[in-house]
Regions:
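Surface-exposed, interaction-prone regions used to assemble/regulate multi-protein complexes
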Residues: 1-127
Length: 127
């Protein structure tokens, strides 16, 4: 496991170097970090032998119903933004013209948090 960034760094990393598009959400976990609500999402990336885990800390809103990773969940589209002092990820975003940029009330499967940390698990990396 290797730390690959936090907040804007991880967003830029997953836009430029790797992508969540066409990945599979393979783990979803609600928990606490330092006494604050957190959500961890593990993605199996499509174009590399790597998995990426995102840990959202100090979660304000959780727009996931149940455990989305209970069944295969393919990421066909997503929003991943730094909005003001918050981090926003939607795995089922509103793609209409009105909802394309920013948070939309029609976005689904989302998390809004103060911070996000990213970790990469590469095959043969030795943990």
């Amino acid at each position: 496991m290797k730390f690959i960034g936090h907040d804007s760094d991880i967003i830029n990393y997953l836009v430029n170097d790797l992508t969540l598009l066409n990945s599979t959400l393979k783990q979803f976990k609600k928990h606490e970090v330092d006494g604050e609500p957190a959500i961890s999402l593990m993605f199996e990336l499509a174009y590399t032998e790597a998995d990426v885990m995102l840990v959202f800390r100090n979660v304000f809103k959780n727009g996931f119903d149940g455990n989305p990773a209970a069944e295969p969940y393919n990421v066909d589209s997503c929003k991943f933004y730094h909005i003001g002092s918050k981090i926003y990820l939607s795995l089922d975003p509103d793609e209409s013209e009105d909802g394309h940029d920013g948070i939309s009330e029609d976005d689904n499967d989302f998390v809004l948090a103060s911070h996000v940390e990213g970790y990469i698990f590469e095959e043969g990396m030795g943990e």
